[in-house]
Amino acid sequence: HILDNIGSNGGRLPTCAVCSNDVMAIGVIRALLEHGVRVPDDISVTGFDDIPGVSNLYPPLTTVRQDFDDLGVMAMKEALFLMGDSDEPGYPASHHGVGLVSADLIIRQSVRTASRC
């Protein structure tokens, strides 16, 4: 999609492709490289999940790592709540469907510093 829209953007690439997961980011990087687009020199690419192996890509992928243990606990609490089995203290109905999971930005070499306009 990025490559298809270059023509409508005066031949310019966007500054960054922010992908919803690392697998998608890997595909974007591969497609860009196959078309002679350099990552991160021509465009930055980020992923999400920090799956195994992304630190070994070329270039190593900048991504977001979330705490899957916390995410699993939250999912189980929500499932128990929805089944009516939640006697979890401190888990009121007002928290139903809402939760925050800690996340860390893992900066690697697929992103460059944005130039000033």
Task: Spell out what each predicted region is.
Residues D4-C117:
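Flexible loop/turn connectors
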